[in-house]
Amino acid sequence: MFEIKTRDGLARIGIFKTKHGIINTPALLPVINPHLMILEAEEMVKMGAQAFITNSYIIYSDEELRKRALKEGVHSILGFNGPVMTDSGSFQMYMYGISLPPLEMVRFQRDIGSDMGTIVDIFSENADYKEAEREVEETVRRARKSMKEKGDMMLACTVQGGIYPELRKKCARKLARLRAEIYPIGGVVPLMEKQKYADIAEIIIESKKELPPSRPVHLFGAGHPIIFPMAIALGCDLFDSASYIKYAKDDRMIFSDKTLRLAEMEESICNCPVCSSITIDELKEMEKEERIKRIAMHNLWQTFLEIKKVKQAIKQGNLWEVVEQRAYSHPSLLEAMEVIKENKKWLEEWENISKRRAFMYSGRYSIHRPIAYRLQKRIMERYESFFDKSVVFEEMEKPYSRMEYLKKLEANCIVESPFGPIPLELDEIYPVAQSLFPWNIDMETYRESKKLCRRFYKNMEVVGVDEVGKKSKDFDLRKIRSVANYQFGKGAGDALFKGDIKVVKSRTTGKIRNVICNGKHVVSMRASDGFFTLKIEGGKRLHSFFPFPKMRVVVDDDASPFIREGKNVFAKFVIDACREIRPYDEVLIVNENDEFLGVGQCLLNRKEMLDFERGMAVKTREGIKDM
């Protein structure tokens, strides 16, 4: 059904399989009104549409259209043979006081051949807490009954709860137990219209905390591209948009970071096929009907382009940078960044161990990215001093260890970086070496760095450089032990590197490439991020050292023979996993009896491995038989 192909934290590029084809996520579903198709489905497919959403209430309430839909199917009405989602009409019920039979609407969507139907949920905008709580209970009750009526149609069970985060969490938790195919987050249209992005961020986060990670999340009614980077970074996969046509009727043009009225525009600031073929003045002088169509096409081009930009950022690993840059386009998005900052501990659970692109500073929120939080936390918890005395240095050119005299100091060398304290031995791991900051950082980053440094020095004796010896010769050994402790956990360095140790370096760069212990290859150090790739011998040593379930991915006994042969681990065969595992971590693959089977790199964290029914969980590097 849904499968992750690549990711940047909670943002997923995935494939979602329906009866009428695959949707590559993240994706936008344009809204089509079957009564008034200003743009045909075929035209929108050429722009990038993969799927559409239409309102089943509109079809249901028109007798002629209803009969045709029941006879020919909704795909025929829309003139599109790909994936079609239907909304139940809940928003119309809220806006116009319409009463809809909940189960009849689900059955109707099923009977007209919708690929993805939606429950009749209760929209809670201005309700007080007690009323919103009752409406959540009713939404869940309807969802539970609707699951029995859906047949082979995928069902979207919408998370409601108004502006109350705890009710959103409660609703999501109860709906998650139903194992629906899609989980929309509803009730955000009024918040979008009022630009209450902080409320939207909190609603998404509290809902995502309880929703099953194996299901795509649809942010209902959020069709303006200004919110796409943030929403996708928080785990939303699907969006729908009626804004493209609604705004066009009002002569408003959508751009990635704003909306402009046509009357206010003097110059074209867009290179889409519409805007590059006519001038702004020509657009203004068009007949109303043609102008609406042209602006609607422009609006869709801009919206699809933003989805493509976000996908590119996911692939490159710099989505948080895009989110931060977009936040400066509207003050309310900066308020949303405060909500995100408060949830960085939770976000870290889903964050990649490293990224393809460097960590680029873009402002005061950069230091609060999940990967920066992880760096700070692990250094505080996992770094082990090698000397009684420590020497502190100001930020310098990276990697810090290029300065040979630092390696010879008989002291713990600590650099005060914008990230906080960085031990010299960890200067090449991601994101330390792979980061760019201006020399003059913002005051919040400066204060955060100084606060972390004070905490780090609390149990250290900090002295001047002239007070320590300068004859240390074992920097490489200190480095590999420190990286192992940071990457795998405290004590990993001693467990991996004991006996006769040979450090193999690149002839061209002089950087560590492999570590051989007692004649056996234990680990390789990656040039891209400064972390280790585990070899079988290294896996054996860590398996013997760490108690179960540390670093483990536990697979079904039936899958064990395939893992030994070096086959990849698929999520459906995972029984359990270590809670500390993060996406793209090196892991130990074991069976139900904790027998060591191999080493690999995971794509998913524990929650995802246990929830997904499709896709790869671990890319096996070596099986025990591969030696």
Language model region names:
Residues E137-V140, M147-S276:
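Glycine-rich phosphate/ribose-binding loops and adjacent secondary-structure elements
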Residues Q487-K502, N518-P583, V587-M627:
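Beta-strand/loop-dominated core regions that host nucleotide or nucleotide-derived cofactor-binding catalytic loops
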Residues L333, M337-Y373:
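Flexible, glycine-rich loop/tail regions that form catalytic "lids" or insertion modules at the edges
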Residues Q376-I429, D500-F548:
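Polyanion-binding interface signature
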Residues Q109, L175, Y584:
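Residue-level signal for inorganic ion chemistry
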Residues M1-G151, F359-E384, F393-R447:
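Non-catalytic, usually N-terminal nucleic-acid engagement modules in DNA/RNA processing proteins
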Residues M460-A527:
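N-terminal intrinsically disordered, low-complexity, charge/repeat-rich segments that act as generic
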Residues A242-E335, E448, K490:
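Gly/Ser/Thr/Ala-enriched C-terminal appendages of enzymes
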